Amino acid sequence: MKMPDLATTGSDIRLVRWLASPGQWVKRGQPLLEVETEKALSQVESIATGVLKEVRVLPNGLVPAGRVIAVLEVNASPPAAIGGSQPLRASSPDAPPAAAPARYKKTFLLSLYERMLLIREFEERVKLLFLEGTMAGTIHQCQGQEATAVGVCSALHADDWITSTFRGHGHALAKGLSLQELLDELFGATTGCCKGKGGSMHVGNMEKGMLPGIAIVAGGIPLAVGMALAFKMQKKPTVVACFFGDGAVAEGAFHEGVNMAALWKLPAIFVCENNLYGASTHISKVMKNTRISDRAAGYGFRGQTVDGNDVLAVYEASRQAAADCRAGNGPVLLELMTYRRTGHSRRDPCHYQPADERDAWFSRDPIQRFSSWLTQQAEISAADFEEIAARIQVQIDKAVENAKQAPLPTVNDLRKGVFG
């Protein structure tokens, strides 16, 4: 195992301490060592499941990226983990999903579960690919927020549109982008959804109704409003769902965009994924009224706060919002309360999240809650979960192998897509 490139301005990384000892069995993704850069302390996770046979760097030593730091003996038969052969269980049974199972077909419920699990497992694999050094740049991941993307996009029509942010992998998979085109894009390949020119922060596919992600905070809001205006002028029954984070509501673009949408009664759903943090700053430090949905009243349209970790609650709220838009009632602001299980980006150790806060939110993990509810209320069997998990792993494994062999842009690709 090599020291990953942590994109520091300095050349070396200081190893603070090992979090596992030689001879210890470790799981893929388990924190293995703590390191320090000029930015912050962070943890480096194991790239495989197995036994830590040897450590080759001592604490306080300076380590350049790419140097071998440990030897792992890969375990051929690791025990089942989240997303493995066992159904996920909720640790918060007193907070089940809101809707009744009789209203939904089994195939639909399982499609929601599979899409959420695909997003989670995709993000976990991407994290490991980054640590292995096979993927360049940085990534902003959405583990813990799968229900917001899946719930909203499942309520949209195929010809509806979404705008996204720098944290857009889940939005892309939920809107129908293929696993392969998304992974190819993260590898910078010409077969990626943006021909390798967008990268992690700008994924999208115009043919599938997803504008390439906008990395500027609140940058997608004016674009979504413009699209909604165009659809209204063209008399199309098309809705635009605009994803943004809680930090975006402090930007002028939010005020300008929602004000215009309200004034002209545009078919836009403003989807605020409120995960409580703008980068490392808690929402309570920047807002007196932290209930973001209340802001809609000031512009004269409906706002609603929803449990963003309940995929069915998100789906129902989004379906009603879309119906309101199509009926000509104007925009809707949905505030989806959720929580990211990772740092702002891969270099963020996330030390600012209090342990008790993390524990409380982790107990309400959207995938665990939904799988438990499916087992108890919709009579989904363990075999169903096992089949889904196995299918996802095969898909991801195949996509990774293909992405590693995908063609990279050449000098001849430099001007493609720039003019005309």
Where in the sequence are the language-model features?
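A short, conserved beta-to-alpha structural element at the edge of catalytic cores
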Residues: W264-S284
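Conserved thiamine diphosphate
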Residues: K232-T238, K288-Q320, S363-A389
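Cofactor-binding active-site loop characterized by glycine-rich and histidine/acidic residues
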Residues: T134-W264, K285-K288, S293, G298-G300
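Glycine/aspartate-rich loop-and-adjacent alpha/beta segment that forms the canonical ThDP
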Residues: D94, D324-G420
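Small cofactor-carrier domains centered on a conserved lysine used for covalent cofactor attachment
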Residues: M1-A76
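Short gly/pro/ser/thr-enriched loop/turn and capping motifs at secondary-structure boundaries
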Residues: G170, L276-A279, R340-T342
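Intrinsically disordered, low-complexity Ser/Thr-rich linker and spacer segments
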Residues: E73-L88
